[in-house]
């Protein structure tokens, strides 16, 4: 098996929160606010937050089956499934395969579905953008963004490792599954799509 660290926060109906390429979200203001009414569970994808990537992992499908096993091991009954960016893609894939496990689905600034043609750039190349441009694209409120200049060497190593893991899971095909859009009809639970108009990614 693969060990997955899970941070629990708050109390109430369970919410499984799947993070994106920046890593776990439990310290952001939205999480503190929601934890007053819900029990948030923040798993860390392998390769993020200083964790290791199993040798046999090479794409997002490995995360899909890892999380199906995790949900079983946590004995979650009808949790709300919430995903951000890459985590939204992962959440959509989980809901397509097994919507009956979840009570509701929330996708925030999700990738995973490519609306344009094969040569349309629907998602910014987050691996090629300079750090400042990436922060400006990803954060409407830069005061909430990470400040790389103030990070320790260990923290910067974690950021670099997060980017490696992010690339492993999302690079080929870039930030989407071309078949996912044709499977979305299988999701038959209440679903909320959240998108920030200033999202530059």
Model-identified regions with their sequence ranges:
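Conserved HGGG/HGGXW glycine-rich cap/lid loop of the alpha/beta-hydrolase fold
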Residues: 2-52
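Short beta-strand/loop motif that positions the catalytic acidic residue
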Residues: 187, 193-195
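Conserved catalytic-core motifs of eukaryotic protein kinase domains, centered on the activation segment
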Residues: 27-28, 51-57, 116-119
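Active-site loop/oxyanion-hole signature of alpha/beta-hydrolase fold enzymes
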Residues: 41-82
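Acidic catalytic loop of the alpha/beta-hydrolase fold
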Residues: 24, 197-201
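Flexible "cap/lid" loop of the alpha/beta hydrolase fold
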Residues: 89-97, 102-135
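Hydrophobic, aromatic-rich cap/lid helix
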Residues: 153-182
